[in-house]
């Protein structure tokens, strides 16, 4: 369902891409989630959000969680909302860098409400 009036005129279409990993996974010497945020910055992508979870269930059925003494198993997500061209550049870069990570890619409408 489209919103009426000026809202729909300013809306853009693209993708919400979310990468799922754990705090202790790395790419090179850097935590993978932080590396993904830096990769987005390097590619000129205007925003990325790194979120930590309390607990998650991995694809292999293993529970991953933070505990009082060890944060290394903490599930983390990096989420970006990008246009189609940015998504293509991002995935090409990840392939070039041989990044191994699970992701979801959803078609979305996005924009900003109000005046800046």
Where are these regions (language model features)?
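Positively charged, small/polar-rich N-terminal and surface patches that mediate targeting and assembly
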Residues: 1-116
